[in-house]
Each structure stands twice: as structure tokens, then as C-alpha cells.
Swiss-Prot record:
A GO molecular function held by the record: P-type potassium transmembrane transporter activity
Subunit structure: The system is composed of three essential subunits: KdpA, KdpB and KdpC.
Stated family: Belongs to the KdpA family.
Coiled coil (UniProt feature): none
One Gene Ontology cellular component annotation held by this UniProt entry: plasma membrane
Bilayer topology term: Multi-pass membrane protein
InterPro entries cross-referenced by the UniProt entry: KdpA
Function of the molecule: Part of the high-affinity ATP-driven potassium transport (or Kdp) system, which catalyzes the hydrolysis of ATP coupled with the electrogenic transport of potassium into the cytoplasm. This subunit binds the periplasmic potassium ions and delivers the ions to the membrane domain of KdpB through an intramembrane tunnel.
Transmembrane segments: 5-25, 63-83, 132-152, 170-190, 250-270, 283-303, 329-349, 356-376, 379-399, 416-436, 484-504, 524-544
PANTHER family: POTASSIUM-TRANSPORTING ATPASE A CHAIN, POTASSIUM-TRANSPORTING ATPASE POTASSIUM-BINDING SUBUNIT
Domain of life: Bacteria
Alphabetical list of NCBIfam families matching this protein: kdpA (TIGR00680)
Protein name: Potassium-transporting ATPase potassium-binding subunit
Amino acid sequence: MAAQGFLLTASFLLILFVLARPLGVGLARLINDIPLPGTASVERLLWRGLGISTQEMDWKQYLLAILTLNLLGLTVLFLMLLGQNLLPLNPQQLPGLSWHLALNTAISFVTNTNWQSYGGETTLSYFSQMAGLTVQNFLSAATGIAVIFALIRAFTRQNIDTLGNAWMDLVRITLWILLPLALLIALLFIQQGALQNLLPYQSFTSVEGVKQLLPMGPVASQEAIKMLGTNGGGFFNANSSHPFENPSALTNMVQMLAIFLIPAALCFAFGDASGDRRQGQMLLWAMSIIFVVCVAVVMSAEVQGNPHLLKFGTDSSLNMEGKESRFGVLVSSLFAVVTTAASCGAVIAMHDSFTALGGMVPMWLMQIGEVVFGGVGSGLYGMLLFVLLAVFIAGLMIGRTPEYLGKKIDVREMKMTALAILITPTLVLLGTALAMMTETGRSGMLNPGPHGFSEVLYAVSSAANNNGSAFAGLNANTPFWNCLLAFCMFVGRFGVIIPVMAIAGSLVGKKRQPASPGTLPTHGALFVGLLIGTVLLVGALTFIPALALGPVAEHLSLY
């Protein structure tokens, strides 16, 4: 079993890096404001036709454009969900959503979280899924990538105050990166058996004589960008464990690769754009080491199974509860780590049914900010925040002014870095405390004791870090939970983007200093270790008390 797990993880990473390297080259061209081959004339027509100014923006203008797009998208999607019953492509005549569920869902998809307090096939029309959620899957992914483009330019440019043009970046990312890749993946899903139609739900009688209603819909087109954009919200309530979304072992592997493809490619692009490929490779090494260790822990926990079941002489020691039998324990464990290391949240197994330690690892990966590959754009700018913190700590130890890629890191950058890193832990801990202190919060818990606390902690961690997965034993479709999680999602997304853009605005005007004998190398094994240690230190200091009350206490109670 250990050999199978090793081969599965190694083959996954090998294929990922082979696919991500060429994509990183294309992304680096866009970061450096170089049109992709054959696109320059099309872009000129687009800029004229859409009235887009090609003038570059400073960080405040860039941020304002990003916020404007997202707030407009939030308003449109909220109204669309409220009035769903008045819109076309609703063959099941589904009613509009309640105000709190519509608000939660709109914020969820605009922030790239895709938390779902509903079942897609019983709640949303085809129009809401296509024109509402799928559109936001593209725009939220493009937003994250645009922000990391601006931050990378801040490191590579000098003595100017502009970071590019947000509207041009958003159009290029959507047209030349997201749409072509999503189309290819969607066609593969359709060929493998995923649904793509606008038919009414189909009634049929099973071989047992039971009448059932099969949901239909444009699944493959949404599924592709759901994974590629690290969105994660399923067309169906069962998410990627549903055979209409994920019909085969091939599509399952493609889904996992799609989740990590752009985050890994952005690391390569960062190295190319900065002029030192070793910088991108350093980030990939740090991310990969944490990822592999987490996969090993989850696989080990799930293979050992539940001690309570083993006492009754179960046929297998594997923890198959909540697992899709088509994929098994090892693949389910790998998928769980992939989807929570990134800000995706799609699932092929119920994380609530994992062992205590097996479920703690996905929770912890979210809590450290999803910087292990992470979401499209957000994962890399989150990890770069930890890079700045690691450089600062190293500077304190050796008595030098910290610098990274030749840019001196001053008080302003460190204040913004600390603010961005502390936003999500504050939301998680205060949100969990609020839920546990109030009767309305506790009433949503369907399990007592440490596991019930873990469900609450997981939900708030997922929302604040824009993941969207859940321990399912929580009744979240209530005004309290919808509003609390909506607030966490909104602040967790834009409360980090704003200081990241402020850091970019501060760094871009600085001159790049040549390396000196006293400069800390940020591309070697020593710095990889320092970076991993910084991530672990922040995660440990912040969340160990909360984890001790939940999954750790539950694990100890099993023996």
C-alpha cells in the first residue's frame, strides 16, 4: 500500500510539472506585457471595440478596477439568484433563493470560495449555474491571477509607480489562458461521459422497480473551470464524487492536475519574469515538500482505519466510510490534500468521514492560508507573503536590512505583510468562538463533542481561506451561518488582496540593488527550510490550541 501511495503521488507531481512548465512560459510573457503569439492584432481590436485604455495604472487604480469588477459581479449574481424563478432555462421551475442564501452564494462564488449551503440540482436553475456561477468562476480566477501579476511586476520593475493595466490583464487571462484550457478539459469530460445538455430532468424506473428522477444540465462546461480556476463548487450536491461530474479514473486525475496546473505554472512564471528561475524553483520545492508530507499523513491515517470499527472485526482496516468506491482510499486521500492545499474545495470523498488525523490535515492546510500551491494567483501571493516574513526574520538574525530580489523590505511592507497574514487566522478564531458562544451557532451542529467542534472550525476555516469544502455534519443554511460565513469569505478575500496590492505599490518604485556578499540567498536549500519553518511556525502558534480541542482530542478519544 505504501508503494502504491508513493507511485500515485510521484506520478501526479511528475505529470503536473511537465504540463506546468510550458504554461509558465506563456504566463511570464503576459506578466512582462508581451502578447502571446498571434494575439496582438486581436487584442488591438478588442481594446478599441471595448473602449479599454491601454494606459498603465498605479496600485490604487489597479485595486479599484479589481474591486469594481467584483462588486459589480456580486450585485448582479445576488439579484439573479433572488429572481431565479423569473429567468429562463429553469425547466424544474425552481424558486428564487432566500436573501441570506443568495447573499452567501453570491459572495462565495465572487470570492473564489464556492462554499455551498445548498444542493445544486435541487436549488439552482440552468441559467443560474451557467450565466451566474460559471461566469464568476472565470472572473474570480482571473482576479487572483491579475493580483499576482501586479505583485510579480512590483519585484521585477524599478523606479516607476505603475503595475500594468488591470482591464488588459483580466481580458488576456480570461481569453488566452482560462477559456482555451477550460474548453479542452470540458471536451475531455464530455468524451468520458460527463453531462452537457439543457434537457429537463429525466424520469426512469430502476431494475428494482423504483421510479427516480435523474438531474441533467450543462455540467462539463462548469466542471472544467471549477477545477482549473480552483473554484470547487459542484453542479451537484455530491460534487466530484457524482459520476455525472467525474465519470472515470481519467477525469479524476485530470481534475486533480487541473487544480494545481495554474498555481504550479505561476511559480515557473515567477522565476522567468524575475530573471532568476531558481526563485520559482525554490517556491515549488517548498510547496512540494509540505504537500508530500501531508499526503503521506492522510494516506497513513486512512489506511489504518477507525479503531472502533476494527474492534468489531471489520473485513478491512481501510477507512472506506464516506469514500467513493470507484477511487478508493489512496486516491481519495490524495484528492483531499490537493483540494485543500489549493483553494478549490471540490471533493470525491466526505472529509467529515475521514479519521480524526486524516481530517485534521486538510483543515490545517486551509488554516495556513492555502499557500501549498494554493488558489490561482492567491496561493503564490500568499506564499510570497511568507517569503517576505522569512526574509525579515533572517534579517533580524544576521543584523541586515531584509531584501528580496534586490528590493529592500521596509517597515511599510512588513506592516502590510503582517496584516495580510493575520487577517484569516483572526477571522477563523473569532468566527469559531462566536459560533460556539451563541445558541444559533451551536444549533447548526449535528454532532456533539470534539467532532462537532471540528465541524464548526472546519467551516469557518474553509470560508475565511476561500476554500469551500466542508465537514458535512453542519446545518449551514440558516441566516446566522450564511451571514457569518459570507462575512468571513468577503473579508478573507479582499482583506488580503488590499494589503498585497499596497505591498506591490510600495515595492515597484524601489530600485533593485545588486547582490552583495552579505545578501541572503533566497534560492537554495537553506532558504527552502527557512520558508517551510516560517509557514509551520505561524500555523502552529496560531491554530494548535483550536486543533487540540477538535481533531486531536477526537483522535485521543479513539484509543
